[in-house]
Swiss-Prot record:
Key word rRNA-binding present: yes
InterPro entries xrefs: dsRBD_dom, RNase_III, RNase_III_dom, RNase_III_sf
Protein's gene: rnc
GO molecular function, one term: double-stranded RNA binding
PANTHER family tied to this protein: RIBONUCLEASE 3, RIBONUCLEASE III
Binding site for Mg(2+): E46, D119, E122
Protein name according to UniProt: Ribonuclease 3
Species: Listeria monocytogenes serotype 4b (strain CLIP80459)
Record: active site: D50, E122
Function: Digests double-stranded RNA. Involved in the processing of primary rRNA transcript to yield the immediate precursors to the large and small rRNAs (23S and 16S). Processes some mRNAs, and tRNAs when they are encoded in the rRNA operon. Processes pre-crRNA and tracrRNA of type II CRISPR loci if present in the organism.
Annotated PROSITE patterns: DS_RBD, RNASE_3_1, RNASE_3_2
Amino acid sequence: MNQWEELQESVGFDFKDVELLKQAFTHSSYVNEHRRENVKDNERLEFLGDAVLELTVSNYLFNKYPDMAEGHMTKMRAAIVCEPSLVEFAEAVHFSKYVRLGKGEEKAGGRTRPALLADVFESFIGALYLDNGIDKVVTFLERVIFPKIDAGAYLQTVDYKTQLQEIVQRDRDVLIEYDILGETGPAHNKAFDAQVIVNGQVLGKGSGRTKKQAEQSAAQFAINQLTHR
């Protein structure tokens, strides 16, 4: 059994177009190093998967919480499809082992980079939608995401920066700093990378469509680090 057969068995779906599945796990760095192979990266599938994920999660929340206000559903959806949550979902189904990376990206630790794993999860959703249809996407989410919603994991939408401050300042005074590490993407679709530093130690990194979202993402990763020690 090769890795793609193993992956299909793991997720419980057979792909009619296995090349589409491979593309979902192909980072641009791999494409740059294998130009003669005529392979495609997963960026377009990520774009599609992002939209499919928002639709399916929105539909689930709409039906599960018939009396919930639009604003609250919007906050819940944002918590579900944010980068830290997507990384958690990707790790739960062991997606990192299947990612195709260039040698440089591999050496730089790309296989465990949060933004990369989040992108792979979205690109897989895009590929699954194209190959198997929306019903199979829902079936997959019924295993990976919807049980967490049912358990109430996202009912309390949190300001992660405030929560982090409350956690680290319980016993002592500390200095919390946020740094914007850089930005990527075109002007109309930028992504920002941020890190949070507590008393000189980097505790979390994250990214987002705005600087504030990136800082919130970094704070959420820091909280996960502190609460799982």
